[in-house]
Amino acid sequence: MDYRELTARERQILGIIIQSYVVSAAPVGSKYIARHYNLGLSDATIRNVMAELEELGFISQPHTSAGRVPTDKGYRYYVDLIMTVKTLDEQEKQRFEQHITPLERKGTSADVLLSAVKVLGTISRQLSVVLSPTLSNALFEKLDMVLLSSTRMMVIISIQSLFVKTIVMELHMQVSRQMLDEVVDVLNERLSGLTLSEIRRSINQRLADCSCDNELKNLIVRSAGTLFDEMPVFERLYISGTEYLVEQPEFQQPEKVRDLITMLEDKFSVATLVEQHHANNPDVTITIGKEHGKRQAEDLTVLSAPYYVGDMVGTVGILGPKRMDYEHAVRILHYMAGSLSSTLSIQN
């Protein structure tokens, strides 16, 4: 976003307005600033600076108040050019580690992600989201098949000792346990160590000379796009802290609560909001208000960051009102992303 370069005084006043509004949820006036901040400026001078900030679109005046509140543009300027993010303090680090570190050796990846999203929600006091990694670059480890009935079987795919994907398939043929075992052995022998995307592209050629049951083999080849594709969003998504979001003053109006709950029930929509970072950029990405391009999300800020497990990339995020303690949210999100990367890499 392009800005007119603000003066030091304008930046200071804008920062104070945002920080005060975050704490109080009440519009901020010039008299409040003059009384509570030792700026060496008169009420009139502060009022003139605020008038200029309003003219530039960084703050606005609610209809029922003499004070001002930040606009999306004001928040964007603040997070891009004003705020400074400190490292996590030791007490917050301990709160993270006491929940996550014990899972390094005894917990599954799902245990780690579920614990992580709960801890993040508790510490941030916002709605928190964790998405398990996308799997195209993940290494296939092994596969098993279990007959559920004469017409259905379950395929269980293990990925890098961390993630398990299960799919139930319909059978239109008679299949014995021996036939399953033969196909499973061939698949594991020829596909183990390949990425899922490599398998999708080349499974037909890799099994072309297979002497195992052709009908079952052909079913697996035809279904490769599903079997070795990404897990569906509802299996990848972990959410915690919805209660913190709906308690915020911004969402007390019934229609806003209804819109918010409707959006949160759409897991694909939530995943789309938080997966806006670039996989090769470890920094926290912040998207504010109308930048989302979704009417239901115009009152929200979304922060997201990638975490890494080998070549796999997952996402951790925070959703909250635009009136958010951005410095705190950024530092805990950055720490959580790093913690997940190290914890899951140890498991791997």
Curated annotation (Swiss-Prot):
Key words, A-Z: Repressor, Stress response, Transcription, Transcription regulation
GO biological process, one term: negative regulation of DNA-templated transcription
Pfam families hit by this protein: HrcA, HrcA_DNA-bdg
Keyword Methyltransferase part of the UniProt annotation: no
Gene3D superfamilies according to UniProt: 3.30.450.40, Heat-inducible transcription repressor hrca homolog, domain 3, Winged helix-like DNA-binding domain superfamily/Winged helix DNA-binding domain
Keyword Transcription belongs to the record: yes
Record GO terms (molecular function): DNA binding
Role of this protein: Negative regulator of class I heat shock genes (grpE-dnaK-dnaJ and groELS operons). Prevents heat-shock induction of these operons.
Family as reported in the entry's similarity comment: Belongs to the HrcA family.
Family matches, as NCBIfam families: hrcA
Name of the protein in question: Heat-inducible transcription repressor HrcA
Organism field: Chlorobium chlorochromatii (strain CaD3)
Gene (name only): hrcA
